[in-house]
């Protein structure tokens, strides 16, 4: 399974580890993804999403029904 937030689309980005001696080696910065069950009152069921912390804040702000409608419009299976 890919490390991508289902709500925001955030995924890994690349950068450098920089040592005290200023040596640079490539690394990945991973998003803060969590599996979370959201209760959807309109469907009377739980929906399990893989979302970042920012994605959870978006769901808190806009509501799970609005976010699910956008996911389904994108063609994502929920």
From Swiss-Prot:
GO cellular component: cytosolic large ribosomal subunit
Keyword terms, alphabetized: Ribonucleoprotein, Ribosomal protein
A Pfam family this chain is assigned to: Ribosomal_L28
UniProt KW Ribonucleoprotein keyword: yes
InterPro entries: Ribosomal_bL28, Ribosomal_bL28/bL31-like_sf, Ribosomal_bL28_bact-type, Ribosomal_bL28_sf
Molecular function in Gene Ontology: structural constituent of ribosome
SUPFAM superfamilies in UniProt: L28p-like
Source organism, top-level taxon: Bacteria
GO BP terms in the entry: translation
Region named Disordered: 1-20
Family: Belongs to the bacterial ribosomal protein bL28 family.
UniProt name for this protein: Large ribosomal subunit protein bL28
Organism the protein comes from: Azotobacter vinelandii (strain DJ / ATCC BAA-1303)
